[in-house]
A protein has these predicted regions:
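Arg/Lys-rich, positively charged N-terminal/basic patches that mediate binding to nucleic acids
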Residues: 1-32
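Short proline/glycine- and basic residue-enriched helix-capping loop/turn segments at helix->loop/beta transitions
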Residues: 42-46
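Basic/aromatic recognition patch in beta-strand/loop cores that engages polyanionic ligands
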Residues: 49-79
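Enriched for short, Lys/Arg-rich terminal
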Residues: 69-97
């Protein structure tokens, strides 16, 4: 199983995604979306180079698309550290700076 750790800011991102999902799509769909995110986090932890280079925002940063969100992460000795999970419509530079 791929090791991953979430930044405190990413934990807030996920809470907000979950709340938005409940309000707009219902509890079941929101839960499924968050479960899918966590499954992808594990996969990325096992395959750290799966994402694309995102070093234009921060050195060694990588990104991977999940449905309508972009996951930004850094490789660690044991897997990955997930910095942010942002909606694709957001200004990444503003939220990663």
């Amino acid at each position: 199983m791929g090791a991953y750790k979430l930044s405190n800011t990413c934990k807030i991102d996920i809470e907000e995604i979950y709340e938005y999902g409940i309000e707009n799509f219902g509890l079941t769909q929101a839960q499924d979306y968050i479960l899918g995110l966590h499954e992808l986090f594990q996969t990325l932890g096992e395959n750290v180079n799966s994402g694309r280079d995102a070093s234009e925002f921060f050195p060694s940063l990588r990104r991977f698309t999940y449905k309508s969100h972009m996951i930004f992460y850094l490789q660690t000795k044991s897997g990955i550290f997930i910095v942010r999970t942002l909606n694709q419509s957001m200004d990444y530079k503003q939220h990663l700076g």
